Amino acid sequence: MEIDILHFEKKYPNFILAGIDEAGRGPLAGPVVAAAVIVDQNNIIAGIKDSKKLSKKKRELLYEQITANYIWATGIISHTEIDKINILEATKKACILAAENLSTKPEIVLVDGNMQFSDKRFISIINGDNLSLSIAAASIIAKVTRDRLMLELSNEFPQYLWHKNSGYGTKEHAQAIKEYGLSPYHRLSFTKALYK
């Protein structure tokens, strides 16, 4: 059975609806980034799906199309804030910030995952990046935005290979931490126990 990726958008036809997804919950370094997208249902961009199912080249192409045609915004929470409030709270904060940063205020906000929000406009959808075009578009914006941020940080700290691993705990990244120690961008709450 084919999944209708516009199912949730069709469910709320008379509301301004935004989709939100995040990138960067699991890495050892860098921020968590959430993106919010309001899709124009009269202008559906072909090929939008969960960013994890797309090649880097395709993600970049879709990023350009989404940002040119849809209302979108990001919310970025730093590694230091993640260490202060924990990754779950930081992710929620990034999602709320992304919604607040939209130039048009959404009446319904679909969020990928199972996080609980006090704001009743926020509806969490498990596997949402496969079930909602708005969330899938947001997953692309979040992923590309975060990858670009990590590329910038990699220019400053090339030894950690963030341009390749985006801050995730790959074997090479772990080896670099052992060899060079932690950078100012590492999440201490993620790395302290591993790399004293």
From Swiss-Prot:
For this protein, the record's Pfam families field holds: RNase_HII
User: What's a BP term from Gene Ontology annotated to this protein?
Assistant: DNA replication, removal of RNA primer
SUPFAM superfamilies hit by this protein: Ribonuclease H-like
Q: Which cofactor does it need?
A: Mn(2+); Mg(2+)
Q: Does the keyword Cytoplasm apply?
A: yes
User: Which positions are annotated as binding a divalent metal cation?
Assistant: 21-22, 112
Subcellular locations according to the entry: Cytoplasm
Give its E.C. classification number. Answer: 3.1.26.4
Write out the GO MF terms.
manganese ion binding; RNA binding; RNA-DNA hybrid ribonuclease activity
Which Cys residues form disulphide pairs?
none
Spell out the protein name for this chain.
Ribonuclease HII
Question: What organism does the record attribute this protein to?
Answer: Rickettsia bellii (strain OSU 85-389)
